[in-house]
Amino acid sequence: MAGHKVAHATLKGPSVVKELIIGLTLGLAAGGLWKMHHWNEQRKTRTFYDLLERGEIGVVASEE
């Protein structure tokens, strides 16, 4: 019975290269989403001020 050997998975430490690649990928994805959000907000603000300058909208409530 002492001759039976069971194959067990050996645990390895973290792979530095794999961790760097995963971190870089997640960072770039999050940064890209943040930039897209920022560009969208910037576009909305620019549109608002363009309409305000042309007189198509106003910031004061009109009296009826």
Curated annotation (Swiss-Prot):
Subcellular localization: Mitochondrion inner membrane
Main subcellular location of this protein, as a coarse class: mitochondrion
Annotated GO CC locations: mitochondrial inner membrane
Transmembrane segments: 15-34
Cysteine disulfide links: none
Keyword Translocase: no
Keywords assigned: Membrane, Mitochondrion, Mitochondrion inner membrane, Transmembrane, Transmembrane helix
Family membership: Belongs to the cytochrome c oxidase subunit 5C family.
Task performed by this protein: This protein is one of the nuclear-coded polypeptide chains of cytochrome c oxidase, the terminal oxidase in mitochondrial electron transport.
Protein name: Cytochrome c oxidase subunit 5C-2
